[in-house]
Amino acid sequence: MALPPSGETQSQDKANYLPQSNPHHLTTYYAHAPGYSHFRNLATTEEEFQPWKLAAAVLESQAMAPLDAFRMTAPLLNPGLAVQSEPLYNLPWYKLSPWNRIPQFTPEVPRFLDSTEHRSSGSSNQNLVLGGGGGQISGQRWEAENLLLPSPVIASLLPDGIKSSQSISVPQTLNQEGKLPFCGFNFTEEELSFVLYGAIASPEHPTDLQHAISGILVPTESSGSNHLHKTLDKDSLQLPEGLCLMQTSFGDVPHFGVFCSDFIAKGVRFGPFRGRVVNASEVKAHRDNSRMWEIFEDGHLSHFIDGKGSGNWMSYVNCARFPKEQNLLAVQHQGQIFYESCRDIQRNQELLVWYGNGYEKFLGVPMNLRVTEQGGQQLSESSEESAEGYRCERCGKVFTYKYYRDKHLKYTPCVDKGDRKFPCSLCQRSFEKRDRLRIHILHVHERHRPYLCSTCGKSFSQSSSLNKHMRVHSGDRPYQCVYCTKKFTASSILRTHIRQHSGEKPFKCKHCGKAFASHAAHDSHVRRSHKDNGRSSCDICGKGFLDQEAFYAHMRLHKTC
């Protein structure tokens, strides 16, 4: 939402113009609109995918729907948009807290050429009915707090007038229900396709053209397939079996897309999306975010993955324009982006990705913000839990990550009140299942380690632990970092390594405040620097030890369980 900085007032004498009804004027009009990255502090309560929406009401100093208005869902991940923009605020959007108060505004009816001024003084909670001509979607409801608004457009860059065939109905007043009447726009399907899949001028190289969606440079001398194929090495993309990179076109503009050469069943997952890790502080230096994904942890922005120049085939998968066209879901799992087929994909169909109904569940992104009548924000229950950490209901201990809270609940007696079916006769623990009791006795009390390494003689309580250990001798490292060439024997080691790229340091010393990327580094620091401050304590269950060897044995016990 392009709001003025604090203390500034908007001009009251700017008129809004609609572009002439042809693709070239539409491209000129939309090319100056800001990208999605400047609207991230705008709350949204929309749950369903509805990309074909045109904004029917904007601030009086702003023009009508930019290219971004056709992709109205979550303004968080957008791997297919190449429209570049300039900063609208002195403070970058990524430094704004997602819980910041959202500036309130009064939606107004736009003023058009040769038309009188029309204003509405309703509250920001008014419902707007939107629609469009040609391939219009009618009957869709749009809340004012969901509205994405473009920045002011320079009048000299717009067409001189409006064709007589473009009849625009500007409502005079609100109806009895306090809502704006229907407002129509005559955009043809061909014009919309040109805007979404046509060519726009590259801001970095004005003589070159870029695809509006993929961001791939379009050859200016020839639009033939032979010339276009020379700009990309398909063999370097390492496409999975059953997929191929093909050229398609909308009108005369060539365009790359990923197609399936064989049938793909529902539920097949591709990935991960490979690229360079970019910290939030570096984003302002990246003018083109067309292939950049945002990674969230516990509902907060962690880092970005930039697929530009990585030779990643997933960066050539285009965005779906409407629900029936979508066949891939973008999901986040363990800090990585995957594409998962949400329906059966027939042979020769193009892969088209967008977000699904499980967007919040997959990404952990706080999407359930609600704007209160006083203008403040009300958090959902899950957002409140993420904001203050994850608390154990039995003992009150707070954990930074849900993973460690769950570990705490699983392995500590604080959650056990002796009311479970299978109590342990050797201690005060009890279990809901008999097999968990058996494993507890073997591992904790009998120190039973039947799985012996034939190479070094080390023993383990579980076969899975032995299998992990054998990788040390065989040299097998199946877990590879997506950001560099390093490989690891265990997924836990890989997770710790990735924090070197992201800069995340979740383990903070309670004595001096110094942060660390791993438990081991944190514990080593405490033992070396704060030995006199007390005895060593387990971060998982809270048990304390004066003897370091006993502490090490206890920590190994958690790893084997």
UniProtKB/Swiss-Prot annotation:
Pfam families: PRDM2_PR, zf-C2H2. Transmembrane segments: none annotated. Its EC number is 2.1.1.-. Gene3D superfamilies: Classic Zinc Finger, SET domain. It is an enzyme of class 2 (transferase). One of its GO terms (molecular function) is RNA binding. A zinc finger (C2H2-type) spans 390-416, 422-445, 451-473, 479-501, 507-530, 536-558. Residues 1-20 are annotated as: Disordered. Disruption phenotype: Mutant mice are born with an expected Mendelian ratio and looked grossly normal. However, both females and males are sterile, ovaries and testes being completely devoid of germ cells. Restricted to embryonic stem cells and primordial germ cells. Not detected in epiblast-derived stem cells. Residues 7-20 have a biased composition (Polar residues). Keywords: DNA-binding, Metal-binding, Methyltransferase, Nucleus, Repeat, S-adenosyl-L-methionine, Transcription, Transcription regulation, Transferase, Zinc, Zinc-finger. GO terms for cellular component: nucleoplasm; nucleus. S-adenosyl-L-methionine binds at residue 355. Its main location: nucleus. GO terms for biological process: cell fate specification; cell morphogenesis; embryo implantation; epigenetic regulation of gene expression; fertilization; fibroblast growth factor receptor signaling pathway; germ cell development; germ-line stem cell population maintenance. Residues 184-373 are annotated as: Interaction with CBFA2T2. Interacts with CBFA2T2. PANTHER family: PR DOMAIN ZINC FINGER PROTEIN, PR DOMAIN ZINC FINGER PROTEIN 14. Transcription factor that has both positive and negative roles on transcription. Plays a role in cellular pluripotency. Essential for germ cell development at 2 levels: the reacquisition of potential pluripotency, including SOX2 up-regulation, and successful epigenetic reprogramming, characterized by EHMT1 repression. Its association with CBFA2T2 is required for the functions in pluripotency and germ cell formation. This is PR domain zinc finger protein 14. It comes from Mus musculus (Mouse). The lineage of its organism: Eukaryota, Metazoa, Chordata, Craniata, Vertebrata.
